[in-house]
């Protein structure tokens, strides 16, 4: 089935925003890329602000569904690793939202509250996940300071929200898979002090994959 013009506009806009940055593009640039007139673009979207809002709606819907999956996941590190990987895939697909995020939210006030609410939902889901993982470790007999859950969740959120910009600042243009592997590796290093032997074995396997992919 042929894509609707509106969907094509959103798909092309997303690609442009991801590749060149939202701030560097105008509605006319998008129209030129689509080889349509600005008037034709205006028929579907009354400017770039509506395009950004529509893309955010897609992004938000996907995140909410994935967070539900994370909350419903089991207690094992393997299950949570898979859900985190899929979530990072989704964030990567809409990565322009994480390039100069503060400036973008100031520019598009219509999505600011929704974005901050979505981040809080991510934080709570990650905190729930950590509680499940640490609870499992506690059953294994190790003493844990559960106050650290908040700090661990904060640090994981820092990776989620700033890993894109951090890689850009270091001029590392990573494709999707290496980017996600590097982010997962950082998250694993945060969790390693709280892992049991079985969890460490799985983490070591994941890290070997990361190091293999990292090699030129």
What label would you give each PLM region?
Residues 111-138, 147-165, 182-193:
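Amphipathic alpha-helical packing segments from all-alpha helical-bundle domains
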Residues 165-216:
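C-terminal peripheral helix-coil segments that are non-catalytic and often amphipathic
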